[in-house]
UniProtKB/Swiss-Prot annotation:
PROSITE patterns: PROTEIN_KINASE_ATP, PROTEIN_KINASE_DOM, PROTEIN_KINASE_ST. It comes from the Eukaryota. Pfam families: LRR_4, Malectin_like, Pkinase. CDD domains: STKc_IRAK. It comes from Arabidopsis thaliana (Mouse-ear cress). The modification Phosphotyrosine is found at residues 646, 746. This is Probable LRR receptor-like serine/threonine-protein kinase At5g16900. The chain crosses the membrane at residues 516-536. ATP binds at residues 579-587, 601.
Length: 866
């Protein structure tokens, strides 16, 4: 019972504090999502986890020995190893003024003792570069900003090798009649109260949780009061900051405050708070009152910047606002100067002051209706792309994958004009929020698992010029209004139950059509088979027919690429040059038409299973076409001679390059990433772009070939299997594949699926990263995945990466690639990603590496120009 009462008391306390902090958002970044909100004991502020406001990042904690000097909200942090841009989304009040604070306490959370730097963005605009070098106690960035919508995005952007992170996010709603500026935001420069002290003032003394630091120079004189000071003006500076003031020392007549700027051209906004702490009594006669009234002028950078003289109010605050357009050489000064004509004897004073630099954010956010629509689409289809964060269209280098936008000028909001969600395994109906993208010109939803009908609203989207709904499970009739649209290209093949014209056939009223169609089809198939059998019997010797009874299944269409054995002899110059050898047979170099280089794979006569694999590869390669799959030029099927003719891949296979068989040439990290993503694209096509889908079943580095430009193409389809509509996407089989690359799940189920290819690709990716053998013979055939998993727990990535790369890589992209590879080789097939996800993740790795290369190039150019 006592515990229950204590719990209820805690809940009521939280509610009380939250109600007192209306308009506050206080996020403890990295605090585990299962941790409840808590009251920070020093300030009484209620902090909660940030997990509901960002889809990415990993929780970290500063080192134990550093925790004592920080308050609780700064002990945890969230760091971002994935993606270039990671964004918080916060619900705010549109067109209301907020103070936004971002806190960064590194605390050597990663053990590297390497202080990071990165960029911080507000929506599509850069706010500030965060550089923590030398800032042992952390850093705080603060800005006063008016959101243009009811959703605010705060993004951390990777700029180099270090990982962005954040400790806390704090938003405070301000009065709209304070800090009023035109078309700019105010970046915090300093906020001081003038007293000899070491105490920071913040909430609850300051109702807006502004943090005031003490400042005092030895040559000044301090005055204080124990009387109450009225702080009731628009700004409400805390009373604790108003009960002291600085005045000139040694009977001086002017008080000088100096500060410096990194950029001398920055515009400065000053807010100076005054209160008279030595009031003249009410009963004092007029002459003495005049003598002891404090009157002075405001002089900035040597010029009077405030037309009227300033007379502080007795024990009450008044605030003077002024703008400084430029500080020569970055040296700024504010002087409070007693007027020589003033009859008063008192010198100037200042109680507190705030200084800001003006930032003009050039880019307008993407049209808010488009943003709402694309986020509803993202949520409906559960699209978890790491780059689908922040503003969809801006900055352009962070444009969401699959989108294109129109850009007029920086002051006009971009519009989404193209949406490509092909091959994303979308399920359910076509989401109606697509129609709210009113400027959409291109819509691609092909190669998914969408159901339901084609919606009428597509016909009403006047901007649409192209719609691709191919290869889904859509049903019913296409709206006539959509078919009647001129200047609209509509693709919808691969939807068996979707009708192009008129009402679809049903079980009633269309029985005659239902019966006639299959009968006619059966007759046509029978005649075709009969013709094939007759031709086959006439042309083939009986011995060959007995050896290969299913050869008649090769279609007549395939014969268009048929090459005779004599042509094979001619193109290979009687099999002069061997370029490879495998279980299928020998591969020879050759020339087609005396000009085009080709690779000729000849079936060994001793191969008992050769013809089945030969047939599979011919039929597969003749119907798949992808830039990252090796193209079949032709084939030979002549009596006892079987051969496949491929495009020639001048740079051999990936394994030979990794093993050093090509001399001293080491594949750079950017080249390895390109090879990985190109291989992944080939596999993605087999799994998602082919109907029916295909499983390669023998993905390995030796089957990844490189052309003269080092473009990767997947080869050796002899073991591949395709799956018809309605057939389960797995195959029960005898022993296939290559030891080390073969899915361990196969030894339990004797089945191979798309996730088996994913596993094999993960092994290849580990080879690419580490350049280690898949099976280590000197260590009882210990597997590469097991070795890397152990190394990840004991050391950093530099000991895992191929030493031949000599550190020339972006550590973030390597870390991301390693994480991806380990997810691909997860023992549970369900936990492995699909190839579409693999492609997207590898593209992010390439972006990170390209950013490193561009940064390095710019540094070289800068050094040469200087």
């Amino acid at each position: 019972m006592e515990d229950r009462h204590r719990y209820l008391f805690f809940i009521f306390a939280i509610i009380h504090y939250v109600q007192a902090q209306q308009g506050f958002i206080s996020l403890d970044c990295g605090l585990p999502s299962n941790e409840p909100p808590y009251i920070e004991p020093v300030t009484g502020l209620v902090f909660s986890s940030d997990a509901d406001h960002i889809p990415s990042g990993i929780s970290g904690r500063i080192q134990k020995n550093l925790e004592a000097v920080h308050i609780k909200p700064y002990l945890f942090l969230r760091y971002f190893p994935d993606g270039l841009r990671n964004c918080y989304t916060l619900d705010v009040l549109q067109n209301r003024r907020y103070m936004i604070k971002a806190v960064f306490v590194y605390g050597n959370y990663d053990g590297y003792n390497d202080y990071p730097s990165f960029d911080l963005y507000l929506g599509p605009n850069k706010w500030v570069r965060v550089d923590l070098e030398g800032k042992v106690n952390g850093s705080v960035e603060e800005i006063i900003h008016i959101p243009s919508s009811n959703s605010l995005q705060i993004c951390l952007v990777k700029t180099g090798n270090s990982l962005p992170f954040i400790s806390a996010l704090e938003l405070r709603l301000l009065r709209n009649d304070t800090y009023v500026v035109q078309d700019v935001s105010l970046k915090h420069l300093f906020r001081r109260y003038y007293r000899q002290s070491d105490r920071l003032i913040r909430y609850p003394d300051d109702v807006y949780d502004r943090v005031w630091s003490p400042f005092f120079l030895p040559e000044w004189t301090q005055i204080t009061t124990s009387l109450d000071v009225n702080n009731s003006n628009n700004y409400e500076p805390p009373k604790a900051a108003l009960t002291s003031a600085a005045t000139p020392g040694d009977n001086g007549t002017r008080l000088t405050i100096i500060w410096t700027l990194d950029n001398p051209d920055e515009q400065i906004h000053l807010y100076v708070h005054f209160a008279e702490l030595e009031p003249v009594g009410e009963n004092t006669d007029e002459a003495l009152r005049t003598l002891f009234t404090r009157t002075f002028y405001f002089v900035v950078n040597g010029k009077i910047s405030y037309d009227e003289s300033i007379t502080p109010l007795d024990l009450a605050v008044s605030t003077v606002e002024t703008v400084v357009n430029k500080c020569d050489g970055g040296n700024c000064s504010l002087q409070l100067v007693r007027s020589e004509a003033s009859p008063g004897v008192r010198v100037p004073l200042v109680n507190a002051m705030e200084a800001f630099t003006a930032i003009k954010f050039p880019h307008s956010e993407t049209n808010p209706d488009d943003v709402i629509s694309i986020k509803v689409i993202q949520a409906t289809y559960e699209l978890s792309r790491v780059d689908w964060q922040g503003d969809p269209c801006l900055p352009q280098q962070f444009l969401w994958t699959g989108l294109n936008c129109s850009y007029m000028n920086m002051s006009t909001s971009p519009r989404i004009i193209s949406l490509d969600l092909s091959s994303h395994k979308l399920t359910g109906k076509i989401v109606p929020d697509i129609q709210n993208l009113t400027q959409l010109q291109k819509l691609d939803l092909s190669n998914n698992k969408l159901t339901g009908g084609v919606p009428e609203f597509l016909a009403n989207m006047k901007s649409l010029l192209f719609i691709n709904l191919s290869n889904n499970n859509l049903v019913g009739s296409i709206p006539q209004a959509l078919l009647d649209r001129k200047n609209l290209k509509l693709e919808f093949e691969g939807n068996p139950k979707l009708c192009a014209t008129g009402p679809c056939n049903s079980s009633s009223g269309n029985k005659e059509t239902t019966v006639i169609a299959p009968v006619a089809a059966a007759i046509a198939i029978f005649i075709a088979v009969l013709v094939l059998i007759i031709v086959f019997i006439k042309k083939r010797p009986s011995s060959i027919r007995a050896l290969h009874p299913s050869r008649a299944n090769l279609s007549l269409e395939n014969k268009k690429r048929r090459i005779t054995y004599s042509e094979i002899l001619l193109m290979t110059n009687n099999f002069e040059r061997v370029i490879g050898e495998g279980g299928f047979g020998v591969v020879y170099h050759g020339y087609l038409n005396d000009s085009e280089q080709v690779a000729v794979k000849v079936l060994s006569p001793s191969s008992s299973q050769g013809y089945k694999e030969f047939k599979a590869e011919v039929e597969l390669l003749l119907r798949v076409h992808h830039i990252n799959l090796v193209s079949l030029v032709g084939y030979c099927d002549e009596q006892a001679h079987l051969a496949l003719i491929y495009e020639y891949m001048a740079n051999g296979d990936l394994k030979s390059h990794l093993s050093g068989k090509h001399g001293d040439c080491v594949l750079k990290w950017e080249n390895r990433l390109s090879i990985a993503v190109e291989t992944a694209l080939g596999l993605e096509y087999l799994h998602s772009g082919c109907k029916p889908l295909m499983v390669h079943r023998d993905v390995k580095s030796m089957n990844i070939l490189l052309d003269e430009h080092f473009q990767a193409k997947l080869a050796d389809f002899g073991l591949s299997r395709s799956f018809s509509v309605g057939e389960e996407s797995h195959v029960s089989t005898g022993v296939v594949g290559t030891p080390g690359y073969l899915d361990p799940e196969y030894y339990r189920t004797y089945r191979l699926t798309e996730k088996s290819d994913v596993y094999s690709f993960g092994i290849v990716l580990l080879e690419i990263i580490t350049n280690q053998p898949v099976l280590e013979q000197a260590n009882e055939n210990r597997h590469i995945a097991e070795r890397v998993r152990t190394m990840l727990t004991r050391s950093d990535i530099s000991t895992i990466v191929d030493p031949n790369l000599i550190g020339e890589y972006d550590s973030g992209s390597v870390r991301k690639a390693l994480k991806l590879a380990m997810s691909c080789v997860d023992p549970s097939p369900v936990a492995r990603p699909d190839m579409s996800h693999v492609v997207q993740e590898l593209k992010q790795c390439i972006k990170s590496e390209n950013l490193r290369l561009r940064t390095g190039l710019n540094q070289v150019i800068d050094s040469k120009s200087s």
